[in-house]
């Protein structure tokens, strides 16, 4: 079964735009769980423009599903993850001022750096995932670094899907097969939506997890959070 992890960063963005605590990020996360989400994802950035470190600490003891913290592994980020001990940490190669993730790791160039991080998090009992594109070599070096999983960066798929679904999914099927052959788990995320999620899941049914935030929260403005989560989970049913 492919798990749906809801990224709640956009909820925090809305809260921070006005100040105060409305919407309540913690309540939304707990409601997502109650409505069927199998995980919660947060991406705390250095400027705390959406999720704050205090949110991460507040969420950890309250969540009953998988907690995934993603981000660039700066010393501050590593320290936060080791203190909070989520179920999973997803490493992304973002610059501090980046609006959103837009590429996977060059795992070959960063092999020693990533290997050390995999060891650090692994010793703490935290499952590791490295954000990568579909290049076979990058996936192979993620395995060499000791990653438990990779998360495929799916923006190229989402962009091409409306024009040519078969061409859009083809490199991701191959990347998914390589990942499976190397014994790693498989996650996916970035620009997945109700438009393109079911097609991806149909062709890669062994996905362990999809992390979805922007599209899901946008859909919830029209359908409500409960129905939206149900619709996304329907896309993940065989």
Swiss-Prot record:
The record marks 151 as: Transition state stabilizer. GO terms for molecular function: pyridoxine 5'-phosphate synthase activity. CDD domains: PNPsynthase. It comes from the Bacteria. GO terms for biological process: pyridoxine biosynthetic process. NCBIfam families: pdxJ, PRK05265.1-3, PRK05265.1-4. This is Pyridoxine 5'-phosphate synthase. It comes from Phocaeicola vulgatus (strain ATCC 8482 / DSM 1447 / JCM 5826 / CCUG 4940 / NBRC 14291 / NCTC 11154) (Bacteroides vulgatus).
């Amino acid at each position: 079964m492919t798990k749906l992890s809801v990224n709640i960063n956009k909820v925090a963005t809305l809260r921070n735009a006005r100040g105060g605590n409305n919407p309540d990020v913690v309540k939304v996360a707990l409601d997502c769980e109650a409505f069927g989400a199998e995980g919660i994802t947060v991406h705390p950035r250095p400027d705390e423009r959406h999720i704050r470190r205090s949110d991460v600490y507040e969420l950890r003891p309250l969540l009953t599903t998988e907690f995934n913290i993603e981000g660039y592994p700066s010393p501050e980020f590593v320290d936060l993850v080791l203190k909070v001990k989520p179920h999973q940490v997803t490493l992304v190669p973002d610059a501090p001022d980046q609006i959103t993730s837009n590429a996977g790791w060059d795992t070959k160039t960063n092999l020693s750096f990533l290997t050390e991080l995999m060891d650090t998090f692994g010793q703490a009992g935290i499952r590791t995932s490295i954000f990568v594109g579909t290049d076979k070599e990058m996936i192979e070096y993620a395995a060499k670094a000791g990653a438990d999983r990779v998360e495929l960066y799916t923006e190229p798929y989402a962009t091409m899907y409306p024009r040519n679904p078969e061409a859009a999914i083809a490199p991701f099927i191959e990347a998914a097969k390589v990942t499976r052959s190397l014994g790693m788990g498989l996650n996916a995320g970035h620009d997945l939506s109700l438009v393109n999620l079911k097609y991806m899941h149909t062709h890669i049914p062994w996905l362990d997890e999809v992390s979805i935030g922007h599209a899901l929260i946008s859909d919830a403005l029209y359908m409500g959070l409960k129905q939206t989560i149900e619709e996304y989970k329907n896309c993940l049913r065989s």
